[in-house]
């Protein structure tokens, strides 16, 4: 039996949303009706994220960064989405992402 959840009118902030579990969670929240802020240290269109170490560099080189693509998929579901670069170790960046142009976050999915 599937559990139905209506998150219409809610804003979710998902960190680590460029791939894997964070990306899957962001899409699931959007399917449940939430607008989503996708916060990740990497965006496809942005150079320079390699400074965050070898994992970031490998992910970019292998085309495994999907933050902006995920935002487009969420918009395709009829929800609002915003992809932002955010270092979750920097409190000011997280607070800025949580109070984005979509409004204050109602849901936080730390990944």
Language-model regions, residue ranges each:
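Short-chain dehydrogenase/reductase
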Residues: 1-104
């Amino acid at each position: 039996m599937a559990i139905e959840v209506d998150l219409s009118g809610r804003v979710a902030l998902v960190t680590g949303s460029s791939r894997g579990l964070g990306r899957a969670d962001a899409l699931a929240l959007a399917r449940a009706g939430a607008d989503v802020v996708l916060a990740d240290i990497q965006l496809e269109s942005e150079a320079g994220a390699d400074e965050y170490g070898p994992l970031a560099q490998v992910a970019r080189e292998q085309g495994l960064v999907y933050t902006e693509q995920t935002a487009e998929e969420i918009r395709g579901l009829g929800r609002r989405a915003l992809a932002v670069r955010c270092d979750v170790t920097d409190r000011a960046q997280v607070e800025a992402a949580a109070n984005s142009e979509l409004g204050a976050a109602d849901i936080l999915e730390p990944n």
